[in-house]
Structures are given as structure tokens and as C-alpha cells.
Amino acid sequence: MRLDVLEADTLVRVGWVDVWVSLYWDSPYYSEGGFTLEVRPTTENLQLLTEGRWLVRSDETPRIPMRICARANQNEDANLVLSGYPATWILTKRVSAAPIKGQNAEAAMRSLVAAAKPWPRLELGTAYGFDTTFDKQTSGGTVFAYCQTIGQACDLGFRIVLDGTGADKRLLFECFRPTFDPNNRYSPKWGNLLNAGWSFADTDYANVALVQGAGEGSQRATCWVGDVDSTGADRREIYIDARDIQPDEEKGETTASQSYLAKLADRGGQKLLAQLRTGSIEFDVDDDTLAVGDVLRVSLPQLGYTAMVRVADIITESQSSGTTRTIRLGTPSWHKT
């Protein structure tokens, strides 16, 4: 593996690194990701590895550039330590106030990127036509936060890939979602799920929200949202004070107007997005064919669980003792067996 170094704006290769003390490289599906690279503080490295430049792995397809965001030598050996993020970092530097609700997820992400102020060589890539709809509502924030919210709700990955060669290189934004390969089955009993670490929790899980807006006492605007037909132990409620949302008097809205109650329902839907069951599992594999976004069937017989789950991150760690790949799985849909 070699790390090519690209100029910040032109994307022209200005050098490469193939010797390091250590490398940590986290390739994400719809999260932040990042890297840390430690090298000797040679004159060549100090001049080559500067903030704003991009690192690209020679063994990676598609090529996902990582931006150098920070440099330091505050360590015992005074080595040069670099850290940064995938090219989707660009989207953290662009903001929007556009409301997104009931829209096609891929189209919504692409529209946000297209509407943002230009970034050198950043363009829209291929539209693959994913038909998932973002049924919730979100508004206000960085374009990255929008994409992350939409992606997590719709199981849709997003990335910025390096395309082209020489002076024709471009950064292309695209969505992606690999389909399930029945050969991707992992379990300790088959010897291909190693050093498994897991955690599950439903402490903060909620599926029904009682939202109250303007008004006082029995006249206060109130609505229920979520899985309102659920009962018993399957029903998990939260209360949301949305008094900050007021009727638009200029448009004749009152606390009983359907348009106003819809605003309260939207607030409830947004809050429920943050009240999910959590579950994660990490394990080591020797399978070099797995890629970010791949769907796996994972079994933990000792716990009586199986899950269909996506690869949320692939973490590559390289140092003098060798290279390891760790698979980090996203929040799965676990089922008792």
C-alpha cells in the first residue's frame, strides 16, 4: 500500500508516502470516518504533508481522498503526526436552511450538494436512482449533517470519490448502497468472526411522542406522533415541549389549525429519530473482499442473536508488526433465534 499525496485544489499528485511508523484509516458508510498517520519528521515529509492536501490509498477502489486537517509533533519521538477526514469533510464547511421532508433520499442529498457554494473540482457524480424516501423532516445545519441524518434514516451511504487522471481529476459526490451477497455470513462457529465485541441497549428508545405547542392548560395544542397504535411494553413514549413553535398569525393560523399541528408533528418526528435502539458489534476478519456498505448476516449463537447488518466502517491499522482490518458494523436489526 502506498499513500499518494495530491495538491489541495488541483488534485495533481505531488508525491507519495510508502514508509510510516503507524497508520489508522477509517473508511465510513455514512459517518465521519478519519485517519491518523505517523511518519518520521524528515524534511521531505514536512514539506510534502501539509494541511489541505489529500491522501489517497493506492490499493483502494473507488479512491476516497482523505484531507490532511491537522499536523503535530507533540509526542515522545517528535514524529510528524497527521490527522484528517474523508472528502465528505467538505460538506461540513457548507450549510443550508432548506427543509427536507418526504423527498427521495438520494435526490435530496444531491440537491443539497448542488445548491451549496462551489468547492474546487467538486461535482455531482452518477445518480443511481435509489427509490428510498426520507419520510421524516430535517432542516438547518451543515450539508454533511443533512446527508448523515438522511443516510442513517434511509440506510443510504454517501461519499466523495476521486475520478479521472492527471489534470482532469474531479471530486464526485455520490450515494451508494450495496446489495446483500448470500456468501457474506459470519459466526464464531465458522471461524470467520474473531475477537467479537458487542453492545446492545434500548435505554433511550422511544417510538411515540406527545408534542405540545402554544396555548395554556386544556387549550394547549397537542398531538401524538410515531407508532401511536403500539401497546404494552412495545410502546415507549416521550414528551416534547414545542412551545417555541408558534402559529403563523399573519397566515391566520391558530393552535387548532392542521398546518400548525403538522409543524408540531414534524418536531416530534425529528426527536424520535434520536431515540433509537442501539446495537453494535465489531470483529476482525481476514477477508479482503469486504467493502464499506456490504450487507452481512451475522450470528452470535452464545447470545441467541442473528442480524442483517451493513459494514458501517472498515478500519485499517498498519505498523511495523503488520496490517489489520477491523470491520465495524452499523446498528443492526437483531432477531432472537
Language-model-detected regions and their locations in the chain:
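Oligomerization/assembly interface segments of phage tail-like spikes and tubes
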Residues: D26-T43, A78-W89, V211, Q275-D284, ...
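N-terminal "assembly arms/tails" that initiate or stabilize quaternary assembly
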Residues: V14-W54
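Short beta-strand-centered interaction patches in the first periplasmic/extracellular domains
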Residues: E76-V81, Y85-L91, T126-A206
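Surface-exposed cap/loop segments at beta↔alpha junctions
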Residues: T42-Y128
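Acidic, small/polar-enriched beta strand-loop surface segments
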Residues: R2-L3, T179-S321, S333-T337
